[in-house]
């Protein structure tokens, strides 16, 4: 159970809406309740949904940070689906696409076909588990714990591939939001929470990438003190507990 909680560090630190937060909390509760009561097959289903949510949040970050690349990833979809994804206002809109298909967006962060094939196997496991086929694939805690270890390896791998996206997202945030006079929120903490974390669904792991960002890249910016102030506020307010 303790290892399984590691996934929380890859999910959004906080949410823009209470509905989204309640949904993720519901999935965690479903996982924990079924795990505790030995219903490991159902615990796996809830954990898989949390994992797919993580993938949706990563794809959302691509959409927000590299919209041109995201648009290229839409090639091959039907016009209606393409428009739906292009106009998406929430990462959960990606759930309208077949899970195996949505994984192809991970090519945009340099995940090759071999890796995506491995990730797709997790979707196949979910499909086998969710259908009434007379089989209990996860009948023991050991079996589920082994699968959780495998899932977390995949999550960490995807997170590593996402690093350039997070760095680009944060760099742009610092450049565009360093002036309290012409940004969305005059207070640094509010700007970070609402515009950086909520709009991009940043996780604790993402925030760690931001904290390690070298702000000296922007030392020639006319408002470098404002950039330093934003960065220091992030590091102070979101230091890993």
Task: Describe the residue ranges of each PLM region.
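Amphipathic alpha-helical interface elements
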Residues: 1-103, 121, 160-182, 221-240
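Charge-enriched, short contiguous segments at helix-coil
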Residues: 18, 105-172
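Acidic-enriched, low-complexity/disordered segments with a strong bias for Aspartate over Glutamate
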Residues: 29, 69, 87, 112, ...
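General structural signal for secondary-structure boundaries
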Residues: 97-101, 109-112, 137-141, 196-209
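Short flexible/disordered coil segments
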Residues: 126-135, 194-202, 232-241
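Acidic, Ser/Thr-rich low-complexity intrinsically disordered segments
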Residues: 173-232
